[in-house]
Curated annotation (Swiss-Prot), chain A:
Part of the ABC transporter complex PotABCD involved in spermidine/putrescine import. Responsible for energy coupling to the transport system. This is Spermidine/putrescine import ATP-binding protein PotA. It comes from the Bacteria. The gene is potA. It catalyses: ATP + H2O + polyamine-[polyamine-binding protein]Side 1 = ADP + phosphate + polyamineSide 2 + [polyamine-binding protein]Side 1. GO terms for cellular component: ATP-binding cassette (ABC) transporter complex. The keyword Cell membrane applies. Its main location: membrane. Belongs to the ABC transporter superfamily. Spermidine/putrescine importer (TC 3.A.1.11.1) family. GO terms for molecular function: ABC-type putrescine transporter activity; ATP binding; ATP hydrolysis activity. It comes from Marinobacter nauticus (strain ATCC 700491 / DSM 11845 / VT8). The complex is composed of two ATP-binding proteins (PotA), two transmembrane proteins (PotB and PotC) and a solute-binding protein (PotD). Keywords: ATP-binding, Cell inner membrane, Cell membrane, Membrane, Nucleotide-binding, Translocase, Transport.
């Protein structure tokens, strides 16, 4: 069912001796919404620009179906881009901007007019055709940029952090809008962002990138709940890392792990474990339970910060050994013990089975943040 | 982006630009440097052997006096431009935005008008029986006409008149960038008007002052037609000397050496300007 | 006082700047021969000007020189600005520096160096030498004007055009040139005016075969008063004013 549309293999690129992409392989399926997620300098923009044809890989190939695009100039690729700051032609009207790509294809005038009008109607800008870009709001410019790219009916639409210039509320609206467009058009979207929330809420699949290497490729849920490594776990969402030590491996596909002196039974992870081995126990803030200090379960600590977030109450708890724990609880107004004061002693626990285990990694030396290429 | 189809275009542009600058800027300047260390020759302008005679001649009291006088007039011109221009630029930056555009426009209109013609217009005013003298006499302020034309003052007035916009424009641009917050912050921290001026306004506008000096001082030594029209034979600029040596006296080595003097002055001013910009954290050009 | 002092001061300085120009214009209509007294309204100096064949010839020569110098320097200057903006190449800083030095150097230094060059290579002083010289001193101004426009230019625009199917040439024609057009026009007008106004450089590199207006004016005003100059100056003033308004209008319109 899932058919590969765009196939990237062994892509390698260096800028001034620095590896931006390192033998990267990625298959993009037909009709999916895939997001390239990572911090600045991770190579996501370079990767996107390579698909568009603005950068050339030092090594590797880009293929669309069975057509090799590696050396095809951008104007001959059936892919179109929505640029970060829209890149609308300032000297052309909205209509002429959208018509530009069709004029390049030398389409008949009548057809151009109809298709441009359709595209503008699709982004609800049919009344703005004669305006110049600078007479539009940021959100409207964004819509024009999208209309201009999709009017050519590309096989793949490349979106380079298209929402980063919009304010929070507008960004949410545009996220929904983009999802709707993608469903209606059935075009494959490749979306670049450094905003993990955006990536999780919009995508069918997320590619987490760091230093030109794919850290993880999976559905938003997989990436969030089962991060492949510490980087992904840290980058996507907030996470508590508890130090654990394997006590013993049980016969029934479970292991017993010592966490803060508590013996907990976890499902056996998919990496090999042996007794005495250290590992990380990952728990999302929403998986943490804050209990009364006289509860028999849990680790003792005290509340050092309480942040009211509307639907949730976020706390920071200092355990006795100094570990900092983030907890995010949904309101339960019927629970009288729910609210704790600052400095109040509490116990911290979680439901077994919600944890995620990762092996310890040799800590990489802290590296200078590169520029986003 | 750097596709192969662009390479010939890129190469052609670079060759054209480099060619133009090498042939019409670098080579000619090297020729001048070369000429300045050669011997004067009535037939072919210059000839061997190499000599530093031209530079020695610069120190000849006769010429030294002319140069110092020229430097004095240029310095006076610059000072007058600065004294008029600094408050002017300040006041201009305080005017409402709409009027500012118009006022800037009015400032550059004279700059776009032929400078010879404008110098000549000054002559109409300053001449012995010109408008100023006639006006003052009919008002009874003076009894007989003053000698205004063909004086040092006339040359300075002419130079100021031609060069004032070049002082004002860079000053205006630094005053435009001078944010009101700085002044408020300074007042807020207890500085009075005078100490705010000395400690905040002056350092921040210094690059503009130096740019203005650079744009006024050097031309004020080179615009030879101003003394020709207003100054008579006793108020010459370095420019007049160079022109005479090249076109009349045919002493190329000496003219070349004099022009190198001007170039060195330029280099010095550019260096000072860079330094002042770096001090307030802007990149020098 | 706080409001009136700066305004009075501004007005005073503008007055000083404009008095000579007003005097010039008024006296261009003066019937008097001596030049200092008012002798009634007349167009005689304009008539004299237009009947002076050498003067009219010099005017045409100047106009043609300014047109060609502005055009050539805009072409080369625009290409230079594009190269500086788009390409990375060795010696870019040197190139930038050289342009800056040309702009800042006293005109007379440029003038004698070009004279030396032209004599060395045996170029007949005339139209060609004037053109080469004028293009050289106009060049940095054009480069700066175009560079300023390019620095505000979104790097993604050419890419967007390519992305939508334009090849390099089409992109240049449909996007790059239209976007930098105002700067090209402004640069051209600046070059035109600089060329038309130049005395210093032209004094050195022109020959008897090609007399231009500033030099003709120069020889007229060096001694005594020539009322025709008033008329000529007024004409030049009107001409530059039209050009200036045109250029400002273009720049303002493009900013919208």
């Amino acid at each position: 069912m899932k058919q590969t549309l765009l196939s990237l293999s062994n892509l390698t690129k260096q800028f001034d001796g620095k590896k931006v992409l390192d033998s990267l392989d990625l298959d993009i399926f037909d009709g999916e919404f895939i997001t390239l997620l990572g911090p600045s300098g991770c190579g996501k923009t370079t990767l996107l620009r390579m698909m568009a044809g603005f950068e050339h890989p030092d090594d590797g190939t880009i293929a669309l179906g069975d057509q090799d695009l590696t050396h095809t100039p951008p104007e001959h690729r059936p892919l179109n881009t929505v640029f970060q700051n829209y890149a609308l032609f300032p000297h052309m009207s909205v209509f002429d901007n959208v018509a530009y790509g069709l004029k390049m294809e030398k389409r008949p005038k009548q057809e151009i007019r109809e298709r441009v009008e359709d595209a503008l109607a699709m982004v609800q800008l049919e009344d703005f055709a004669r305006r110049k870009p600078h007479q539009l709001s940021g959100g409207q410019q964004q819509r024009v940029a999208i209309a201009r790219a999709v009017v050519k009916r590309p096989k793949v639409l490349l979106l380079d952090e298209p929402l980063s210039a919009l304010d929070y509320k507008l960004r949410r609206t545009m996220q929904v809008e983009l999802k709707r467009l993608q469903r209606e058009l059935g075009i494959t979207f490749v979306f670049v962002t450094h905003d993990q929330e955006e990536a999780l809420s919009m995508s069918d699949r997320v590619v987490v990138l760091k230093d030109g290497l794919i850290q993880q490729l999976g559905t938003p849920r997989e990436v969030y709940e089962r991060p492949a490594n510490l980087f992904t776990a840290r980058f996507v969402g907030e996470t508590n890392f508890f130090p654990g030590r394997v006590d013993k491996a049980n016969g029934d596909d479970t292991i017993t792990v010592d966490v803060f002196g508590l013996k907990r039974t976890f499902r056996k992870p998919d990496f090999p474990v042996s007794g005495g081995q250290s590992l990380h126990v990952l728990l999302r803030p929403e998986d943490i339970r804050v209990l009364a200090p006289d509860d028999e379960d849990g680790v003792a600590g005290k509340i050092v910060e309480r942040n009211y977030k509307g639907s949730t109450l976020d706390s920071v708890i200092h355990l006795e050994d100094g570990t900092e724990v983030l907890a995010s609880e949904f309101f339960d107004e019927d629970d009288p013990t729910f609210d704790y004061r600052l400095g109040e002693p509490v116990k911290v626990s979680w439901v077994d089975g919600w944890e995620w285990l990762l092996p310890t990694e040799p800590e990489a030396l802290p590296e200078e943040e590169g520029t986003d290429a | 982006m750097r596709s192969l189809t662009q390479q010939p275009f890129r190469a052609a542009v670079l060759v054209l630009v480099w060619g133009w600058l090498l042939f019409l800027v670098l080579t000619p300047n090297l020729l001048v440097v070369g000429a300045s260390v050669m011997t004067r020759d009535p037939g072919s302008f210059i000839s061997l052997p190499l000599t530093l005679d031209a530079y020695r001649q610069l120190l000849d009291p006769l010429y030294l006096e002319v140069f110092l006088h020229s430097l004095y007039m240029a310095a006076m011109t610059t000072l007058v431009c600065l004294l008029i221009g600094y408050p002017f630029a300040w006041a201009l930056s305080k005017v409402g935005k709409r009027n500012q555009v118009l006022l800037i426009f009015l400032l550059i209109v004279p700059f776009w008008t032929n400078s010879l013609v404008r110098t000549y217009a000054l002559k109409l005013i300053l001449a012995t029986n010109g408008l100023l003298n006639n006006g003052l006499m009919s008002l009874g302020v003076i009894d007989g006409p003053m000698q205004l034309l063909y004086t040092e003052g006339a040359v300075i007035i002419g130079l100021v008149y031609l060069l004032l916009p070049f002082m004002i424009l860079p000053l205006y641009s630094v005053f435009e960038d001078l944010r009101e917050d700085y002044l408020r912050a300074s007042h807020d921290l207890g500085a009075g008007r005078l100490s705010t001026f000395i400690h905040v306004i002056v350092p921040l506008t210094l690059p503009g002052v130096l740019a203005g000096i650079m744009l006024v001082l050097l031309p004020a030594m080179g615009l030879f037609f101003v003394p020709d029209i207003l100054g008579g034979s006793r108020n010459l600029l370095v420019g007049n000397v160079i022109k005479n040596q090249f076109l009349d006296a045919r002493n190329w080595p000496f003219g070349a050496a004099a022009s190198i003097l001007l170039t060195l002055a330029m280099a010095f001013l550019m260096f000072a300007h860079r330094l002042s910009k770096r001090r307030i954290g802007e990149d020098g050009v | 006082m706080n409001r009136w002092l700066p305004r009075t001061y501004l007005t005073l300085v503008y007055l000083l700047l404009y008095v000579p120009i007003v005097v010039l214009v008024v006296f261009s209509f003066n019937d008097s021969r001596t030049g200092y007294e008012w002798g009634g309204l007349s167009l005689r100096w304009y008539e004299a000007l237009l009947n002076n064949r050498a003067m009219v010839q010099a005017m045409w020569n100047s106009l043609w020189l300014a047109l060609s110098a502005a055009t050539v320097s805009t072409l080369i200057g625009a290409l230079t600005a594009l190269a500086l903006h788009r390409y990375r190449f060795r010696g870019k800083k040197v190139l930038n520096g050289m342009l800056f030095v040309v702009m800042m150097s006293p005109e007379i230094v440029l003038a004698i160096s070009l004279l030396a060059l032209f004599l060395l290579v045996g170029l007949q002083l005339g139209y060609v030498s004037l053109l080469l010289a004028h293009v050289t001193f106009c060049l940095p101004f054009v480069v700066i004007t175009v560079m300023a426009r390019l620095s505000g230019f979104d790097e993604r625009l050419p890419e967007a055009a390519r992305d939508l199917g334009a090849n390099d040439f089409t992109m240049t024609r449909t996007v790059l040139i239209p976007v930098i057009m105002p700067a090209l026009l402004a640069g051209w007008l600046l070059g035109f005016t600089l060329s038309l106004d130049d005395v210093v450089v032209s004094t050195f590199v022109s020959g008897p075969s090609y007399e231009i207006l500033p030099l003709r004016i120069y020889s007229m005003v060096r001694v005594g008063l020539k009322p025709e100059v008033n008329a000529l100056g007024t004409l030049l003033l009107v001409f530059s004013l039209v050009m200036l308004i045109l250029s400002q209008w273009i720049l303002l319109r493009s900013k919208r």
